[in-house]
């Protein structure tokens, strides 16, 4: 059995975890909960915290460089911010259409 973890494998695992967090938000995209529900926000915050700890652990083990760890975190944060922005804009558009009708 191989006792080491390849860098490529570790990064893939972390990217898979990041994708799961993004899917959590995408699956709620059609719901008002994403923009108005504190419980959902706390779930996302908890997931992000857990992910950041995984990245820190991989960095401390020397599997990732600091730059790679920062990139993984900033990429996920940027994508999550975009998802939140998209949901906010869609909600605003629906509200405007509702006011016109």
UniProtKB/Swiss-Prot annotation:
Belongs to the UPF0358 family. Pfam families: DUF1507 (PF07408). NCBIfam families: PRK13666.1. Disulfide bonds: none annotated. InterPro entries: UPF0358 (IPR009983), UPF0358_sf (IPR036270). SUPFAM superfamilies: EF2458-like. This is UPF0358 protein EF_2458.
């Amino acid at each position: 059995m191989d006792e080491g973890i390849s860098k490529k494998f570790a990064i893939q695992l972390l990217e898979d975890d990041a994708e799961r967090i993004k899917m959590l938000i995408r699956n709620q995209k059609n719901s008002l909960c994403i923009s108005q529900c504190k419980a959902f926000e706390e779930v996302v915050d908890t997931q992000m915290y857990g992910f950041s700890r995984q990245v820190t652990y991989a960095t401390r083990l020397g599997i990732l460089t600091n730059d790679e760890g920062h990139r993984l975190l900033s990429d996920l944060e940027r994508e999550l911010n975009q998802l939140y922005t998209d949901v906010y804009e869609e909600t605003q558009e629906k509200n405007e259409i509702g006011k016109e009708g």
